Amino acid sequence: MILYQVHHMWYETAMIQECWDSVLAALKASPNTDVKIEICLNKQTYVEKPNEGSKVDDFFSKHLDHSLFKDPRTSITIKTDKDPFYNIADWRREVYDVKAKYTVWGETDTILPRDFFAILDLVQIDQLHVLTFAGRPMWDNSWDVVTHERLQGYSKPCQCDVHKEDCIELLEEPFKYKDYITQAELDKFNDESGDVKIEQVPWKIDGSTVCISGGLETPFIAPGMHFVREDTCFEYYIRKKKIPQVCVTSRLKGHNY
């Protein structure tokens, strides 16, 4: 079984439709894969409050008819101001299934490769590990180890004065990390990327679509940590435990920062 979990804050809801459409498309592309979905709708206003006259419930209401919300595989958790402060690091620390093949960290701003669940279903790695999907070129070269194989070779950050031939700014949209990529653009790019290739890489974690194999000791995020840098905390954990990271270098995720 694969557990896909995602935490949505009320102020992120403009991105939910695209996120859920993408998850649903990946589920439909792999109909025989056993997948459970766990979604947290976080209505807390401890950090930010809606504009005067707006209600937090209104931000979520238009999404409640979505097919993913009604899917029998989907479980919903709701957090409100009646609960103690709770955020994405709490969710990621708590929602991990030690018996699942993978627990996947979804993100509101991230769309999936169409064959995402099919790949996870087919992969067979007989040891504890973390699997990630390739990203677009980031703000510095340290991220090249988890960058898609077709998007390598650009100098980062922008250094046009000394890197006129390979400056990151020469890469066309939407293939830099700061560009917005649509599902159609992502699907086309991945369709043109050939066979699935998986390689062990040096540890480098960004929180979107991290796929954590079953069997890890918990907690792997510090108790009491609520949000910000929980992915870095997890990277420190797997480094210390020497748990290998592998990357699907030929499949791009759509992390729209």
Placement of each model-derived feature along the sequence:
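Hydrophobic targeting segments
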Residues: 1-7, 23, 35-39
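Active-site beta-to-alpha loop of glycosyltransferases that engages the nucleotide-sugar donor
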Residues: 6-20, 43-47, 83-86
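Short, well-formed alpha-helical segments that are part of the catalytic scaffolds
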Residues: 12-27, 50-57
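Active-site-proximal specificity loops/subdomain of glycosyltransferases
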Residues: 46-100
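Short beta-strand-to-loop acidic/aromatic patch adjacent to the donor-nucleotide binding site
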Residues: 101-111
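Conserved catalytic core of nucleotide-sugar-dependent glycosyltransferases
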Residues: 113-221
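Acidic donor-binding loop at a coil-to-helix junction in glycosyltransferase catalytic cores
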Residues: 227-236
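Active-site donor/metal-binding and catalytic loop motifs
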Residues: 228, 247-257
